[in-house]
Amino acid sequence: MKKTLSLILTALTLLTFLLSSQLCFADWTPIYDDEDTFYFIDLSTKNQAQRPRINVLRDFKTPKPSGDQSAKLLYEADCEKNLIRLMSGIYLKKKMGTGEVSGMINSNGWMNPQSRPVLEKIHTALCSTP
């Protein structure tokens, strides 16, 4: 049990490091904004796997009560089944994915991308052919 927990924590730490270091130099393309948040994707991170993944940045227009100002996220699509899911992410204390990491975001399972306009845009970016 302790070994499994240790492996999970190590994997989460590695994921956080990879998200933080890789996305610092991202080429963010705006895709959507609503009353609270600007959304960006980094097309250079899109892979061509059976279930493609892409990095997404949420930049909050005003800081959250916790002080978070942005979040870096990893989304995955199942293009055949027309589904999308948040794989993981981190909250950050500064704008545009910078600053101290303040928390982790876990997967929320598969969703229909039509449930939210921003998810439709992310799904389209993931499932469109180059």
Describe these PLM feature segments.
Residues 1-11:
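Bacterial N-terminal signal peptides that target proteins for export
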Residues 9-21:
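Bacterial N-terminal signal peptides
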Residues 22-130:
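N-terminal secretory-pathway/extracellular module detecting exported/lumenal segments
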